[in-house]
Amino acid sequence: MHLYGFKYKDTPFLDKHANIVMNNMLSAGPNTPISLLHGLTLSHGTSINIQNNVITLAKKAGLDTAWLSNQGALGQYDTSISSIAHQANHVTFLKTTGYDFGIRSFDDQLIAPLQKILNQPLPSNRSRLIVLHIMGSHPNPCDRLPQQAHHYVDNNNTNCYIDTIRQTDNLLSQIYTALQHSGQPFSMLYFSDHGLSHDKNSYEKNSIVRSESILRHNDCFYQNYHVPLVIVSSDLTGQLRNKAQRSGLELLDGVAQWLGISTPQLPYSEKFFSKLNSSQLHVLDFHQRLQPVNKLQNDPLPANLL
């Protein structure tokens, strides 16, 4: 992402409008189910309490809630997150089965149901939390695009990945415009639930260079966990970059702080956006075992992208 120093300008909206940028945010896990189950429920890396989650937290605080999803509603990788989503007051899934089954749908198709929610008035003393769960750059990134990717390097998988970042940035711009037209103050919190790394099997076992490999899930590299977390607010100006290290295991605390909710069950909810590093930085591997971040390997950008 250009917002985080990438050379191609694939985030023009965030470059201009991001007010708070967490430079060193790490996802709770290496894939969507692990990351969101531990990041959006009362967990902190231990047993998951799925009934205490971001939706129930918001509802208990009196917020109207909506969950709009371009991910799957059913399946091995989707049902657990879907169970959280269906606790919201308003629920829309573009897909009725798994994320990779049936007719392809694209993230910008969530704008219409978003607009429908925004058109439903709320009492003047009530707020609303709207969650948009998108596909973003999920493998295979070429499947996330409605058109051929632009050419940046001689690797189409990489080209598609770059263009999905640009596509997500454009989606955030559309959401921002819709919120502006609502005439109400608003705040947007954007984050990714995991990163990707170059697939070692595709370049170590097939005698090709790393720059020609594809991007996949893994739990061995820092890049599998290093993710964007950005706030865009109608009442903020300028851009603040926070270099504090944060694990997605504290994400629910961060969402609570963003929403202005305080509870003893979320001990980090008053300091998630502080400039102090988390004391013990851990993430979860594929087996949901805690591993220290400083033990992760590095998967740097290939030379043709520097």
Regions found by a protein language model. Give the residues of each.
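Active-site rim elements
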Residues: 44-45, 155-163, 176-177, 214-218, ...
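Histidine-centered active-site microenvironments of extracellular/periplasmic hydrolases
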Residues: 5-9, 184-185, 191-233
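A generic fold-level signal
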Residues: 31, 124, 160, 183, ...
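Active-site/pore-lining binding-face segments in mid-to-C-terminal subdomains
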Residues: 196, 230-231, 244, 257-261
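Flexible, surface-exposed loop regions and adjacent strand-edge segments
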Residues: 148-151, 206-208
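A long, amphipathic alpha-helix that forms part
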Residues: 111-120, 149-191
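C-terminal, low-complexity/hydrophilic appendages and adjacent surface loops
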Residues: 222, 289-306
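Active-site-proximal alpha/beta segments of enzymes that process anionic O-linked groups
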Residues: 1-148, 224-226, 248, 252-280, ...
